[in-house]
């Protein structure tokens, strides 16, 4: 699997430090079915046995051509995609065996910024509602005013304006929507973020700004 090619930063890690995320032998295989009875005749090995650790404050990049399994690996780590085999440990917990209910409290700690910003946003929600909703679910902020103030600050951090809170997703360009999605992911103060080519649609100057923020 090409998703097993990595780029790591040069963060100094103590040998005694425990990884925030540990992935061992992660596999995601999709069955290939044929015939009227839809019998399984083979498997597509989207992810086939990857291993890596990520420590607090560290950045790791999965590098590979389109369709090699990078997105599938990210979704499997967050339990958004069922894995075929392997173990995912997050902050000491074996999340690969967690149910949806058990994963719910961890959604604050583990976030993803999807490659398609429009598909990951509710077109009927204003930007304010989209950013504030996860804060309400995770009980971040003591009041609605606190949450709105935080939403404004996050928008400004990603190069947007406070008045954009009252608008809807269709009123923005692809790059602007992606910046909004990044602000939404940061709203719950996660420990770990998966970025699925999250800055690929942004201008170079904005890319640098957002990467520094992350």
PLM ranges: what are they?
Residues 86-94:
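Conserved ABC transporter NBD signature motif
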Residues 36-41, 82, 95-111, 137, ...:
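ABC ATPase NBD coupling module
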Residues 182, 194, 210:
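Hydrophobic anchor residue at the start of the ABC signature
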Residues 94, 145-163:
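Conserved ABC ATPase "signature" region
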